[in-house]
């Protein structure tokens, strides 16, 4: 079963994952479809179902529980018409095996070609799980080479208003931005961002530099994700 929740601004991963659910014939339930029309119409106050911009409170979880229960009730009511014979799970994969042999690299696993502003250090959010970070409080720059199919970054979002925006370039082309600012949010946390996805492994030159116009400069890279 796939259960799709929602952020206060309406963001949901329904559009991202619904094709996977359809391909494997999985049940899909949308909390967004239940609450967002009511929030948009003003008949439901977001603060009644969430203490922040994303996490359900007790009332929010109650609604989710009702959504799941109603679906399960519909299944129980139709048991006589459901074929419960064993079926081999031999459905062809919907996507390529992009993340086979995936790994998370720390700062000490990278040999920079160029580096300034970044230092190797830890963090206070995941000090034991991810102790090997690239950290900058000033204007950091990092350049390294790697060979991979897919590339992403695991970095720290911060509520102190100091989180900077850093552009990521692959082979000279900007592929994404790491935005570490989460001012006013519920707390510091690790954010993942995919930068590159491909079926074939190739050598790449990766650069991380402060985005134009970013007045904040702090960034902690918790890990570099590759496959």
Question: What is each stretch, according to the model?
Answer:
Residues 66-227:
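Conserved catalytic region of serine esterases and O-acyltransferases that act on ester linkages
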Residues 3-4, 34-47, 115-128:
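Hydrophobic transmembrane alpha-helix bundles
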Residues 1-4, 153:
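Structural beta-sheet core signal
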Residues 7-103:
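Catalytic His-Asp segment of secreted/periplasmic serine-dependent ester chemistry enzymes
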Residues 2-3, 11, 202:
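Generic low-polarity alpha-helical segments
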